[in-house]
Design a protein with these regions (language model features):
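ATP-binding N-lobe of GHMP and related small-molecule kinases
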Residues: 1-131, 135-152, 157-167, 171
């Protein structure tokens, strides 16, 4: 998968110099679904299924998202100067919501970034495909922008905050 991500990144953005690679697993709750956001107990387990990403900083304020799973949608472009959910962003509202949540929490990004993803979690399967994408995005932002103060728990909570408040989805 590493080679395919880098190849697609190079095809889309001219080269793959300075690109970092990432992975975020999906998860299953062994004691049932929909208990997390209803205040119930959870017993999650990470999976080998997940979301892979390649990313690097840009020299402007633009953010480019591309999903190898949704080639027909092409590159989705957003701006750090307009952190709003737009219908035309489609699936990219999930990672862009994490960018928004970082800003809401006081972590501003000095420049944009390019990101290519591919995932093998079936959408709607209850295996947390959106959470995987949100945590992946959080890890990418933490790494690219040197935000060392954030823990993995912080990143998970930022993902939840973005999905609840930017995308309007009740999740845990």
């Amino acid at each position: 998968m590493k080679e395919k991500l880098l190849e697609k990144f190079k095809e889309l953005f001219g080269n793959a110099d300075g690109v970092s690679l990432y992975f975020s697993p999906g998860r299953v709750n062994l004691i049932g679904e929909h208990t997390d956001y209803n205040g119930g107990h959870v017993f999650p387990c990470a999976l080998t299924l997940g979301t892979y990403g390649a990313a690097r900083k840009r020299n402007d304020r633009l953010v480019h998202f591309y999903s190898m799973n949704l080639d027909h949608l092409g590159v989705i472009e957003a701006s750090l100067d307009e952190l709003v959910n737009k219908k035309e962003y489609n699936w990219a509202n999930y990672p862009f919501g994490v960018v928004w949540a970082f800003a809401e929490k006081g972590y501003t990004l000095d420049c944009g970034f390019d990101m290519v993803i591919w995932g093998n979690i079936p959408n709607g399967s209850g295996l947390s495909s959106s959470a995987s994408l949100e945590v992946l995005t959080g890890v990418i932002l933490k790494d690219l922008y040197g935000i060392d103060a954030l823990s993995m728990t912080d990143l998970a909570l930022i993902g939840q905050y973005s999905e609840n408040n930017f995308n309007g989805c009740n999740c845990g």
